[in-house]
Regions:
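Alpha-helical transmembrane segments and their helix-helix packing motifs
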Residues: 1-230
Length: 230
């Protein structure tokens, strides 16, 4: 048995056991994962806006780097993130360690509570001083406008490539032994997909909800429920 199989089988068993034993605890861990990514998204937005006043070209670099820290939070604090679970659980199902029906149930449950966590933190951040002073020139407005302006094909292909980067981050963190190397591979892989503006479901929960609770949402013409769901 390879090291990958050992790690995946152990992770699947742990996740399934937690889900079976306590839906409440699993929901809380899922909410925290959504919250961690919303935290790093919020800080990244403010950081990008501040750096844009002096060196606009660095805004994307700043946001991508700060956002990546959110995934490190998820990994260190053992949050349940839907996109990382897609790798663990589908691999476990492929090897026959967990039923496909259970995989789908856990993923749907995890995704829903990732959204709840993002929703709650987005509301809280929008009560803060920093988010009360966002303008229609904010990085948040630009980022969401770009995302909602993409074609369905772009969303499909970029969703795949984003998950490839996330998988690399999770695999590196799981297989490497040196802590500094684990953090570097996680940060670098996530930085890359964010810098490319690829589509990540939970990251979109964060950015859309942060904008949705803010008055500058009116600056995004295509910020509609139908377009968001697309």
């Amino acid at each position: 048995m390879s090291q990958f199989q050992e790690k995946v089988f152990a992770a699947c068993a742990k996740k399934e056991a937690l889900f079976n034993e306590s839906l409440g605890r699993y929901a809380l861990r899922s909410m925290l994962a959504g919250a961690y990514l919303t935290m790093s998204t919020a800080v990244g937005i403010i950081g990008a806006d501040i750096i844009a006043t002096g060196i606009p070209a660095l805004s994307r670099f700043v946001f991508a780097f700060i956002f990546a820290i959110g995934l490190v939070f998820v990994l260190i604090f053992d949050g349940e993130l839907a996109t990382s679970n897609m790798m663990f659980l589908t691999s476990g199902a492929y090897y026959g360690k967990i039923k496909w029906s259970k995989v789908c149930t856990i993923l749907l449950y995890c995704t829903f509570f990732n959204f709840v966590g993002a929703l709650i933190l987005a509301w809280f951040f929008n009560q803060s001083f920093s988010f009360h002073h966002l303008t229609d020139k904010s990085f948040l407005v630009t980022a969401v406008s770009t995302k909602l302006g993409k074609t369905d094909w772009m969303n499909f292909t970029e969703g795949i490539t984003a998950n490839m980067f996330v998988t690399l981050a999770i695999l590196g963190y799981m297989l490497l032994k040196e802590e500094s190397a684990k953090i570097f591979i996680a940060l670098s892989a996530i930085f890359m997909f964010v810098f490319l503006v690829n589509e990540h479901l939970i990251a979109n929960f964060a950015s859309f909800m942060l904008l949705g609770f803010n008055g500058v949402r009116d600056a995004v013409d295509n910020f509609t429920l139908a377009n968001i769901l697309r």
